[in-house]
Amino acid sequence: MYKDIATPTRTKEILEKYGFSFKKSLGQNFLIEPNILHRIVDFAQLSERTGVIEIGPGIGALTEQLARRAKKVVAFEIDQRLLPILADTLSPYTNVSIIHEDILKADVQQVIAEQFTDVDDIMVVANLPYYVTTPIIMKLLTDRLPIRGMVVMLQKEVADRMAAKPGTKDYGSLTIAVQYYTHAETVMHVPRTVFVPKPNVDSAVIRLLKREQPAVSVSNEDFFFAVVRASFGQRRKTILNNLLNQLPNGKEKKEQIENALANAGIDPKRRGETLAIAEFATLSEQLYPIFYEEA
């Protein structure tokens, strides 16, 4: 039986052996509490037929737990200094592939086609670097990858925004974007004390299970998200004011925008954070002909 990597003693041994120093610019914080890793893997509900994509494996603490449960693990690591460490710590596992590439620049669709030829389902499981959490998640969602979902650790504040409900302070355009594609649920809070080095923020684990179809049906997704972003442009302003100020030539189309709100059954004095995703969809459909009739 191999010793878990994610203990203070074992992590220190590995880092000292390789003279590794953390790069703040890469948001490197390594977990040193194996029980938390076990729970993350449990939340992912892996089987012996599951393929896993990991982002930022670090020294392999989560990777080894995934390798023990999944059919195959493919991990993207941007820091070249970690490659020899991973080759060492993960040497007992024949079902792990490390790809030295920035996930944001990678053709993940192609990687899936090449690496996961014999799996029943695919999950993304990762302790994400906090400085690029949102871009990574949005890339994985908008690329329409054939994944079942994600279980990822990230900054608690970001997890709160992704899983927020309408009318709360955390509810915003990120909430809508994530919940358009997935069912989002915060499944665990993680204190900053279980990492080295200790981050300045607390963490949370969020589970995003992909919807078979988006949460709402819209004519144009780009325009739908433009309306959502416009509605949250200035949180203290009404939805009408935000649409007038944030949409192209909005002020020139004031009467049409007011009519669109009326047709959607939305009080123009409401604020964006009070609208449910279905209301944004209805509003987007009413506004779409106004802004695309000349397009």
Curated annotation (Swiss-Prot):
The keyword Nucleotidyltransferase does not apply. Pfam families: RrnaAD. It catalyses: adenosine(1518)/adenosine(1519) in 16S rRNA + 4 S-adenosyl-L-methionine = N(6)-dimethyladenosine(1518)/N(6)-dimethyladenosine(1519) in 16S rRNA + 4 S-adenosyl-L-homocysteine + 4 H(+). Keywords: Cytoplasm, Methyltransferase, RNA-binding, rRNA processing, S-adenosyl-L-methionine, Transferase. It is an enzyme of class 2 (transferase). It is found in: Cytoplasm. GO terms for molecular function: 16S rRNA (adenine(1518)-N(6)/adenine(1519)-N(6))-dimethyltransferase activity; RNA binding. S-adenosyl-L-methionine binds at N29, L31, G56, E77, D102, N127. InterPro entries: KsgA/Erm, rRNA_Ade_diMease-like_C, rRNA_Ade_Mease_Trfase_CS, rRNA_Ade_methylase_Trfase_N, rRNA_adenine_dimethylase, SAM-dependent_MTases_sf. Its EC number is 2.1.1.182. CDD domains: AdoMet_MTases. One of its GO terms (cellular component) is cytosol. Belongs to the class I-like SAM-binding methyltransferase superfamily. rRNA adenine N(6)-methyltransferase family. RsmA subfamily. Specifically dimethylates two adjacent adenosines (A1518 and A1519) in the loop of a conserved hairpin near the 3'-end of 16S rRNA in the 30S particle. May play a critical role in biogenesis of 30S subunits. This is Ribosomal RNA small subunit methyltransferase A. The gene is rsmA.
